[in-house]
């Protein structure tokens, strides 16, 4: 770990009422002595002059000193809060850099130092960037929950449970005389099932947190001429897709990225699904299924003039049967302006059914509200947190190892292999909080931060 003293502007570049220069490291006290003549009293705001090497005043403002380890980074930290003109702030940084042993901080280096000094874990460090980058009130609240340790707490509880079970299994293997039938007495199985159930709950919360942060991927799918491209245009509020009465007009994937009350939504329009001999259209249909496989939600577009059915399994059973098992489906019955259907929401076989007219805009607002609710808009956030794609991947890896461990227990009664799967589960979960994390991943995470954070 570096022992350099670092400096950076902590406020956004440009003109503002207040600008903050942050210094962290062993030489922070030297900076204070050089610029304001003394080291301020710890955790007290002091109004003073900021001087250059000749004793001339560069600016006037507030100096704050935090003695390590009781600071954000865990090191000595000095903050100089002056006027927010960029020239003034540049002059202050230049003055600080005149002191030997100080360099400009890399992006995210203050947060990285805090992580290295155990002031916060990796999910909390990531939450700082997520809070800054939040595009909605929901995202900001969720990021704050993660910053306060909600996500970390859930992961630590899982790690503790897995560790305890692993230690029990390994101890029973090492001392078989004391626990002859330990693999078949039900105790290990019950503990393992509880861990799997707990992980399922955390995965569901993390999935929701990822949608709040990164947006929900919604794929519009259905037969040709059902109105899929018209719906894309209606949701996007512009003519993104060509709309004609010719079946198979859309042959490739079309994407629109929009925000609903600040929450990101990624809408994918796909080629109409049917049997065809047209090579180009076949490629488009293959791409449509590839998009469906990675979707968070499918809008199953139905031409309401062709069927009265509302149950998705009755409308097109082959399509529904081919969808991923956990993929949610919203049935969208289009052309309500022609069928005269009431624009109400119903539930059929676990799927929401909406009636709209993509052409006239009838029911589009209600469908948008539905999509916002799926993203967690204005939902109860107590215990909620923000999550990233890497978190979901780590949780999925942990879940896979637990399932393999369950198989080793139930089918083979293989204690050693169960213990190994529990160890791999520990490793996967510990990647989330940064207990076991590669330097390359740390560099990628902190390198995406703002300079000064």
From Swiss-Prot:
Names of the cofactor(s): K(+)
Binding site for Mg(2+): 229, 250
Keywords: Cytoplasm, GTP-binding, Hydrolase, Magnesium, Metal-binding, Nucleotide-binding, Potassium, tRNA processing
UniProt binding sites for (6S)-5-formyl-5,6,7,8-tetrahydrofolate: 22, 79, 119, 453
UniProt-recorded name of the protein: tRNA modification GTPase MnmE
Cofactor note: Binds 1 potassium ion per subunit.
Chief location bin: cytoplasm
Pfam name, any one: MMR_HSR1
EC number from the UniProt entry: 3.6.-.-
Compartments (UniProt record): Cytoplasm
CDD domains associated with the record: trmE, TrmE_N
GO biological process, any: tRNA wobble uridine modification
GO molecular function terms noted in the UniProt entry: GTP binding; GTPase activity; metal ion binding
Domain of life: Bacteria
Function: Exhibits a very high intrinsic GTPase hydrolysis rate. Involved in the addition of a carboxymethylaminomethyl (cmnm) group at the wobble position (U34) of certain tRNAs, forming tRNA-cmnm(5)s(2)U34.
Subunit structure: Homodimer. Heterotetramer of two MnmE and two MnmG subunits.
Amino acids binding GTP: 225-230, 244-250, 269-272, 334-337
Binding-site list for K(+): 225, 244, 246, 249
Organism: Shewanella frigidimarina (strain NCIMB 400)
All residue ranges annotated as the TrmE-type G domain in the record: 215-376
Family: Belongs to the TRAFAC class TrmE-Era-EngA-EngB-Septin-like GTPase superfamily. TrmE GTPase family.
UniProt-listed InterPro entries: G_TrmE, GTP-bd, GTP-bd_TrmE_N, GTPase_MnmE, MnmE_dom2, MnmE_helical, P-loop_NTPase, Small_GTP-bd
GO cellular component: cytosol
């Amino acid at each position: 770990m570096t022992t350099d003293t670092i400096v950076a502007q902590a406020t956004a570049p440009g003109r503002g009422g207040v600008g903050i220069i942050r210094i962290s490291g062993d030489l922070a006290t030297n900076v204070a002595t050089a610029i304001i003549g003394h080291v301020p009293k710890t955790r007290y705001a002091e109004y003073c002059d900021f001087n250059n090497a000749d004793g001339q005043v560069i600016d006037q403002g507030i100096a704050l000193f935090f003695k390590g380890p009781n600071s954000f980074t865990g090191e000595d930290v000095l903050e100089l809060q002056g006027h927010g003109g960029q020239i003034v702030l540049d002059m202050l940084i230049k003055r600080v850099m005149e002191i030997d042993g100080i360099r400009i901080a890399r992006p995210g280096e203050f947060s990285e130092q805090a992580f290295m000094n155990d002031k916060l874990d990796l999910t909390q460090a990531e939450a700082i960037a997520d809070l800054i980058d939040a595009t909605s009130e929901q995202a900001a609240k969720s990021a704050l929950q993660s910053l306060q340790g909600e996500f970390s707490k859930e992961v630590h509880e899982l790690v503790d449970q897995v560790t305890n079970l692993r230690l029990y299994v390994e101890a029973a293997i090492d001392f078989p005389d004391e626990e002859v039938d330990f693999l078949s007495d039900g105790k290990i199985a019950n503990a393992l099932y509880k861990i799997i159930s707990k992980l399922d709950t955390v995965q569901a919360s993390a999935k929701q947190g990822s949608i709040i942060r990164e947006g929900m991927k919604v794929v519009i799918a259905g037969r040709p001429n059902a109105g899929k491209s018209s719906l894309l245009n209606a949701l996007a509020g512009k003519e993104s897709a060509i709309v004609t009465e010719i079946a198979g007009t859309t042959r490739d994937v079309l994407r629109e990225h929009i925000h609903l009350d600040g929450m990101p939504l990624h809408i994918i329009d796909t080629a109409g699904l049917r049997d065809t001999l047209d090579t180009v259209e076949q490629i488009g249909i293959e791409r449509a299924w590839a998009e469906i496989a990675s979707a968070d939600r499918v809008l199953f577009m139905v031409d309401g003039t062709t069927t009265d059915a509302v149950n998705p399994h009755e409308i097109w059973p082959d399509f529904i049967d081919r969808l991923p098992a956990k993929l949610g489906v919203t049935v969208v019955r289009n052309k309500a302006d022609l069928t005269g259907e009431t624009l109400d929401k119903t539930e059929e076989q676990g799927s929401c059914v909406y009636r709209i007219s993509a052409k006239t805009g009838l029911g589009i607002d209600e469908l948008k509200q539905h999509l916002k609710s799926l993203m967690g808009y204005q939902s109860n956030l107590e215990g909620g947190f923000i999550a990233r794609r890497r978190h979901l991947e780590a949780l999925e890896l942990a879940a896979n190892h637990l399932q393999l461990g369950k198989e080793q227990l139930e089918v083979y009664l293989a204690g050693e292999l169960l213990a190994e799967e529990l160890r791999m589960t520990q490793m996967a979960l510990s990647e989330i909080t940064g207990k076991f994390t590669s330097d390359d991943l740390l560099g990628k995470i902190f390198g995406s931060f703002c300079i000064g954070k």
